[in-house]
């Protein structure tokens, strides 16, 4: 796997890990009252989507069970419809989808030459 792909995959994992740390001891309702938390989580989702969009086709093909188009689509939705962010979807993405995605990403050759 080219170094650029490995870097982007690591960026995805770092953003997922950051999101996980941000929600420690938090509840869904905190997104409604804590704008900084919401902005931080949205940014993590954007980074995951942007990094995914810049992966080579070969990198994406090496993990066909990862929903690459949906990941990139989520990023695009957050960027272009910033005025209409669904906090339920952000919370589900970070609490349900991200942990599952992290497991899949860790199976990829992130440190190989």
Where are these regions (language model features)?
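Solvent-exposed interaction patches of small proteins and small membrane subunits
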Residues: 1-113
